[in-house]
Amino acid sequence: MKYLIVDTSSRTLLLSASNGKGDVSLSLKDLDRHGAILAVVIKQFLDLLEISPADLDFLGAGVGPGSLTGLRVGLSTIKGISLPYNIPVVPFNSFDPLAEGICFDDFVICRKGREGHFYWRTYLKKRPGETLFSSIVEIKEKLDKSIVVCSERNEELVDFQDYRTFLLEPSPVLMRKIVLEAFRSGKILSGLDLEPVYLQKSVAEINWDGRNSRKT
């Protein structure tokens, strides 16, 4: 199978691609802007594998939760490849590849959103729960002390010092595993139907709401 998989939901850009004979994977850490390099890296991947977008059997896209800007860049890029050639897309929750590498039975994955708030998802007996966006206080009210709190960044785990914590390492290999399993199970959709998991409003939307509430 020929495929291209991308996740731009965090400061670690994950990519994986295959020409049906071999595959390449890449993890680029601590990126502030995905837009500046994503198209370039994708072209390099496809050139290396000697395939074109029209050759792809499917695409994979991390739909979040995470960086609003990063998700817009990633999903618009995937749509731009999918739509001209009618290539099906496998969407996946960006927390699921992270969960794949965790050995604990019960844990929660957290990723910081705006100040004092986190995206989070519990995995009890490794079964995923609902993806939520809450304040630190609200999260702690709902979490049992026995659960392990996991995050990709040490500075985010500081807010959960009264819990057992675990530092995650984003992996394009685990991302590929999740997406290939989903594709084989028929979990695909059209690029037209690809939607992000935003959960929170952007700063611009918050400011807009604030200005309009003062007018009324």
Where are these regions (language model features)?
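Stable alpha-helical structural segments in soluble proteins, enriched in small hydrophobic residues
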Residues: 45-49, 78, 84, 172-183
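Phosphate/pyrophosphate-binding loops at sites that engage ATP/ADP/AMP, CoA/4′-phosphopantetheine
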Residues: 42-58, 142-147
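Short, structurally constrained coil/turn elements
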Residues: 52, 83, 159-161
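Residues at secondary-structure transition points
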Residues: 29-40, 68, 72, 76, ...
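DPxDG-like acidic metal-binding loop motif
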Residues: 58-89
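Oxyanion-binding and handling regions
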Residues: 1-22, 29, 33-35, 90-216
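Short, well-ordered amphipathic alpha-helical segments that serve as non-catalytic structural scaffolds
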Residues: 34-49, 95
